[in-house]
Design a protein with these regions (language model features):
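Conserved Class I S-adenosyl-L-methionine
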Residues: 127-129, 134-167
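Catalytic cores of RNA-modifying enzymes
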Residues: 1-123, 162
C-alpha cells in the first residue's frame, strides 16, 4: 500500500496496532476491531489530533451519540468530539458475513481529555442507580441533591467528575 502513496511526503500509513505507537498524528482512520471500540474512543479522547474516521459496530455508534439514558462513553465522547455519522454499512457488504451492521463515523476533536477524567467519569457511572448525594459520598464529598445521573446533562456529569478530581 505504501507504494501507492509515495508522492505524499506528509502521509504515514501504519499497518498494525496503532494503539502501541507513540507517533503524533493529525488524522486517524481505522476499521476498528469491534471488541476494542470503547478502548479506541477513550484512547483517542486523550490524543491531540484534528479528526478521525472510524468504522464501528452500529450499536456502539448509537451509544456514542445517545443523549437519553447516558452511558459513560457517550458523555465522554460528546464532551471530547463532534460526532457525525457518515454512512451505515450493511453486514452483507462483508465476507464472511458478520452478525452485525456497521457505521462509519467522523470524530472531530473538541478537546483533549485526561486519563484521570475518563477514569473518574467511568467510576461515577458505576454508581449510576444512586442519587448524586450518595455518589458524591463515595468520593468523600457532600451534596444534598437527590437527582440521579440520568437526570443530568453530559456537561453536568463532567463537572461532577472534575469536582471529584479537584477534591
Amino acid at each position: 500500500m505504501k507504494s501507492n502513496f509515495h508522492d505524499y511526503s506528509n502521509l504515514v500509513l501504519e499497518y498494525g496496532d496503532g494503539f502501541n505507537s507513540d507517533h503524533n498524528f493529525s488524522i486517524f482512520v481505522s476499521n476498528l476491531p469491534y471488541s476494542k471500540s470503547r478502548f479506541a474512543v477513550e484512547w483517542l479522547l486523550q490524543k491531540k489530533f484534528s479528526r478521525a474516521v472510524i468504522m464501528v459496530q452500529k450499536e456502539f455508534s448509537e451509544k456514542l451519540s445517545s443523549n437519553e439514558k447516558h452511558k459513560a462513553i457517550s458523555v465522554l465522547a460528546n464532551y471530547g468530539f463532534r460526532i457525525k455519522f457518515l454512512m451505515n454499512v450493511k453486514k452483507s457488504n462483508f465476507f464472511p458475513i458478520p452478525k452485525v451492521d456497521s457505521t462509519v463515523i467522523l470524530l472531530e476533536k473538541k478537546k483533549v481529555i485526561s486519563k484521570v477524567l475518563i477514569s473518574t467519569v467511568n467510576r461515577v457511572f458505576s454508581y449510576r442507580r444512586k442519587t448524586l448525594q450518595n455518589i458524591l459520598k463515595q468520593f468523600g464529598l457532600n451534596s444534598t441533591s437527590k437527582k440521579r445521573l440520568d437526570e443530568l446533562s453530559g456537561d453536568e456529569i463532567i463537572k461532577i467528575a472534575q469536582k471529584i478530581i479537584r477534591s
